[in-house]
Amino acid sequence: MATPDVSVHMEEVVVVTTPDTAVDGSGVEEVKTVLVTTNLAPHGGDLTEDNMETENAAAAACAFTASSQLKEAVLVKMAEEGENLEAEIVYPITCGDSRANLIWRKFVCPGINVKCVQYDEHVISPKEFVHLAGKSTLKDWKRAIRMNGIMLRKIMDSGELDFYQHDKVCSNTCRSTKIDLSGARVSLSSPTSTEYIPLTPAAADVNGSPATITIETCEDPGDWTTTIGDDTFAFWRGLKDAGLLDEVIQEFQQELEETMKGLQQRVQDPPLQLRDAVLLNNIVQNFGMLDLVKKVLASHKCQMDRSREQYARDLAALEQQCDEHRRRAKELKHKSQHLSNVLMTLTPVSLPSPMKRPRLARATSGPAAMASQVLTQSAQIALGPGMPMSQLTSVPLGKVVSTLPSTVLGKGSPQAAPASSPASPLLGGYTVLASSGSTFPSTVEIHPDTSSLTVLSTAAMQDGTTVLKVVSPLQLLTLPGLGPTLQNVAQASPAGSTIVTMPTAAATGPEEHTATIEVAAVAEDHEQK
């Protein structure tokens, strides 16, 4: 159907419904009402309300807060997908000479690494946008990005712009907003700025006609405001005049106390619940208690710093004491080693005395020498029958040997005669032991059965005055007639020799009595000299 080329300008309010899914995955769709002003150019016929597609009209809260300082309007892109219309809210931003658009629906907390900036048909994060713009040296990306010539941080600190659904989705690591109690926020009664920005042909066509869309912003009713209407002021003044304001304040106080009491009980059990975090955030924002939170943090930080310094000083003192103890231990160890070395040098090494082999000494002349040799004797040896002469070689030197007759030895242990006995003459101050009552016979017969026994003269043995000598290691002699015999013994006996008496039984007839000297036992009698 042909239509005349007539352009008719008219402004209408179009309600556009945009399904929006919550970020937290609750699946609840929010309906946003966007007030737009359209500039329609139909090609014919009268335009009525039937030509405008208005579906799912609903009244809802505004999507965001707009600043009176934002001179540039917010661009809304309309995309038609089937029968549904979806609106995209973007903010033009700059960083240096680079320009981009901030997609508000994707601008979620904390925002620095969230891909929410459309730059040359690519969606990147604000951090990447700052790097591409050559402002990577700036530490704060919110100061590097500007919106209408104003730093993004200043806009967000004043509360004019916040993250998308920040009251529902917060990372607890953001430092983007500060509570503004100075009245910098735009009140509900403040005028809103609107500007007409034409959309691209591919992006927006309403009923087949190009449209210019603007958004009328409104302030969130929950924000802190410093200006109220006359009716509101009259309401509270009426409560005051009626005397009910005190009761209302008491109810407020009781409700707040119960809320804080329950909150205090719940925060004792970790972890912190989401509703408690939301409650704390609302209390801080609505009552301006952020400074109190900062005060608590600053006090705790100061206390921790003091404790850390004290611990550092204590640790340094302990390390110094440890070093001192180690040094003293080394000194004591060195002194101990030095003293040990000194003691080793002063203490003589005790070596075992070598065993002296017995040796024969030449006999010296004179009774004095004989007596000096006999004085060294310290024990006595008893001779008895039953042992040959060859065993006399095992008798140790320096012993006094006595012989007893077989009649005495057979009866029991031999008894030594006292030193005053006439049968026991003295030899060099020592007693020569013999049996009591025995006499020295005139004839003694010796049977030499070893090479160490030598009979000097058998004829001399008959008169009882000749000394019989055992060459080595023992000597044998007779004692009757102590005249020149002792002199000969002193000359012939070596040092350390043994003096032996050979008593025999008394003779009763003309037979010859013989005695054989044998070792019956060896007994040492330790006497004090």
Swiss-Prot record:
SUPFAM superfamilies: SAND domain-like. Zn(2+) binds at residues 109, 166, 170, 174. InterPro entries: SAND-like_dom_sf (IPR010919), SAND_dom (IPR000770). Keywords: Coiled coil, Cytoplasm, DNA-binding, Isopeptide bond, Metal-binding, Nucleus, Phosphoprotein, Transcription, Transcription regulation, Ubl conjugation, Zinc. It comes from Rattus norvegicus. GO terms for molecular function: DNA-binding transcription activator activity, RNA polymerase II-specific; DNA-binding transcription factor activity, RNA polymerase II-specific; identical protein binding; metal ion binding; RNA polymerase II cis-regulatory region sequence-specific DNA binding; sequence-specific DNA binding; sequence-specific double-stranded DNA binding. Trans-acting factor that binds to glucocorticoid modulatory elements (GME) present in the TAT (tyrosine aminotransferase) promoter and increases sensitivity to low concentrations of glucocorticoids. Also binds to the transferrin receptor promoter. The modification Phosphoserine is found at residue 372. There is a cross-link at residue 154 (Glycyl lysine isopeptide (Lys-Gly) (interchain with G-Cter in SUMO2)). One of its GO terms (cellular component) is cytoplasm. Its main location: nucleus. It holds the Pfam family SAND. There is a cross-link at residue 154 (Glycyl lysine isopeptide (Lys-Gly) (interchain with G-Cter in SUMO1)). The gene is Gmeb2. The keyword Aminoacyl-tRNA synthetase does not apply. The keyword Transport does not apply. Residues 80-162 form the SAND domain. Residues 244-347 form a coiled coil. DNA binds at residues 135, 139, 142, 153. One of its GO terms (biological process) is positive regulation of transcription by RNA polymerase II. Homodimer, and heterodimer of GMEB1 and GMEB2. Interacts with the glucocorticoid receptor (NR3C1). May interact with CREB-binding protein (CBP). This is Glucocorticoid modulatory element-binding protein 2. It is found in: Nucleus; Cytoplasm.
